[in-house]
Amino acid sequence: MLESLQPESHLLHDEPDPGESVYECNECKETFSLEQNFVEHKKTHSGEKSPECTGCGEESSQASSLTLHLRSRPRRESYKCGECGKAFSQRGNFLSHQKQHTEERPSESKKTPVPMTTTVRNQRNTGNKPYACKECGKAFNGKSYLKEHEKIHTGEKPFECSQCGRAFSQKQYLIKHQNIHSGKKPFKCNECGKAFSQKENLIIHQRIHTGEKPYECKGCGKAFIQKSSLIRHQRSHTGEKPYTCKECGKAFSGKSNLTEHEKIHIGEKPYKCNECGTIFRQKQYLIKHHNIHTGEKPYECNKCGKAFSRITSLIVHVRIHTGDKPYECKICGKAFCQSSSLTVHMRSHTGEKPYGCNECGKAFSQFSTLALHMRIHTGEKPYQCSECGKAFSQKSHHIRHQRIHIH
């Protein structure tokens, strides 16, 4: 009965001890403890060919050994993406990657896998970049990277935000931007707890705590925490003002300065405080204003203990103790601890008065002065004397009046 089940083997024992051979070859009398080893051995007598590696020709007595061998061998061919040059060892991963390109350009047919040649592989390993921009000469190792770069020169921005209409040259920038609308801020600062929607902004913010300023101006040696600040600063040396107002023709060195200026013409103040009704031109000003109502002041000076609602205010305050005045007027040499103070001061030389009253047309060099002036038209008098009840439009007038009661 047992021999009919295993016609080519001979059972040595009914219940063998662990590790003892139980399968005997009828041809050469060699014994085996595992059936699969015995079966593979029989092929040496029958002349049956062992599994062979198609890559190097190596034979293996067992299929499992061949599988292990194949895993250890470097793959000769990869699947290379014709769009961006990225290579994959497995076809499935390659096809999944291809969907990124077809989603952006649904009208295009899918690219077929291109086996990666030795020349292309060497090109990527050696850093060769055969795709050069005709406008600026910058080179790339993938054609799709060049196409994305060229949008900088053409101004093409095909990816538009459905929330605010802002457009971007690349899909990845749109995805990052959309975090602003969702309110999602997954990147949190371990020092102060401030959260950001983008990791890049957190990295830049952390330099406030570390004091790191990796971007240095070769002209004057001044350093900055972010590259965009350095580029904007360098325009103070070159005099370049690439951003021009379409309404009045005034030019600015920074885009944010132009955006801020343009609100003068349209009178836009879209951000309103729910507590007191004060309106602001920019969301950041509203956020800063909210601290007045909450009274929160998380940033404290180590020298005198004074606390502030914003870290930027603390940084400016610390300069009182250090005497640091990094912002100097090139015309008269007067120095300031804040860049905004220098900006206002410069208007005393240029005569610039960018803040105009919509009621009477009178112009002012500072927005705060315009705000005070507007109370003449609105009749607003927020400062009231506790002694006699008389009200004033300006705090300084209120303080001067109170001296009457003191004397």
From Swiss-Prot:
InterPro entries: Krueppel_C2H2_ZnFinger, Znf_C2H2_sf, Znf_C2H2_type. Predominantly present in heart. Outside the heart, it is detected in embryonic and postnatal vascular smooth muscle cells and in epithelial cells of the lung, gut and kidney at sites of epithelial morphogenesis and in the spinal cord (at protein level). One of its GO terms (molecular function) is DNA binding. Transcription factor that acts as a cardiac regulator and an effector of alpha1-adrenergic signaling. Binds to PE response elements (PERE) present in the promoter of genes such as ANF/NPPA and acts as a direct transcriptional activator of NPPA. Also acts as a cofactor with GATA4, a key cardiac regulator. Binds DNA. Interacts with GATA4. This is Zinc finger protein 260. One of its GO terms (cellular component) is nucleoplasm. It comes from the Eukaryota. PROSITE patterns: ZINC_FINGER_C2H2_1, ZINC_FINGER_C2H2_2. The keyword Disulfide bond does not apply. Residues 115-124 have a biased composition (Polar residues). Keywords: Activator, Developmental protein, DNA-binding, Metal-binding, Nucleus, Repeat, Transcription, Transcription regulation, Zinc, Zinc-finger. It is found in: Nucleus. It comes from Mus musculus. Residues 1-21, 39-72, 96-124 are annotated as: Disordered. Its main location: nucleus. Belongs to the krueppel C2H2-type zinc-finger protein family. A zinc finger (C2H2-type) spans 23-45, 51-73, 79-101, 131-153, 159-181, 187-209, 215-237, 243-265, 271-293, 299-321, 327-349, 355-377, 383-405.
